[in-house]
Amino acid sequence: MARSLACFKLEQSIGREYTSALPQPERQMSTFSYPAFSAKNVARSPVTSGNGYKCPNCGTELSPINAGKTYSCDNNHSFDRAKEGYLNLLLAQHKRSRNPGDSDEMIRSRQRFLNAGYYQTLANAIIEQIPALTPDSRLLDIGCGEGYYLQAINKARNDLQLVGIDISKTAVRLAAKRRFPAQLAVDSGFNLALFDNSIDCAISVFSPISASEVARVLKPEGLLIMVGPGEQHLSGLTAHIYDNQIPHGGNFKALDESAEFSLMGQTDIQQSISIQDSAIGDLLRMTPYYWHATAEQQESLGKLDKLETEIHFNIRLYQNGSVPE
């Protein structure tokens, strides 16, 4: 049975609109200095081995050498730091293709669409769920993409230690070019190069996760915020593609059936939006619907000046471990 968490309340709100502005991203290198957190004017606890990354080969701590240009473990496994500031910790055996993750076109389309503010409602709703996290809490975005939601969180809570991973190298590179402090790595959400019990809160926005792997890296009673599509999500777009639309079923089944997590609460966010001009094509290309649309449907959508659609998100809050009755 879902319970409310007093210090981390999920408000029930359907159709609510949020008006506070989100930061517009700047294409600059992240100011994060791995692995030390660099935000100012906040008291810091010492950085321990659990606050960094572990070697994906042997599981020992990665430490900087060569003026921080390379990270190496005691067994001499080494990983070069990209010029943008991120690490690539994705091993070949954890890849299913040469370039895993979303295509470059999908990622850049999503970046343009999100930067235009169409999902501002969702970003604000996520931010509403984290005020109880204490300074220096470590928040992980699993499938962070090009960093839109992490940057929004940093704007609201610059006292948190932010960590973002994505299996797409292109996405992580774009995230690293945003001007906000975060530990960023190319990594698999199913084989996280993070220490056990090292994360206070994890979020996942439309990204697949491994319940057991997230439970491993979360601290006891740590929190997981999962975002999935509501039944009417993008119904205005799918009406142009399918004759018979099937409501979204969400992506929570594995978590709801997991012994590792307890559901604490959930909320639906629903809003009607009007998408303009080239953003319509970006929306189509950033979703799997692009591959379901015929060439004629893609062309027809590309000619639209305006698209009216619902955006509908289901946000669920889980706690790591069972909750006493």
Regions found by a protein language model. Give the residues of each.
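N-terminal auxiliary segments of SAM/dcSAM-dependent transferases
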Residues: 30-99
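Conserved SAM-binding loop of SAM-dependent methyltransferases across substrates and taxa
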Residues: 146-158
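Conserved class I S-adenosyl-L-methionine
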Residues: 136-145
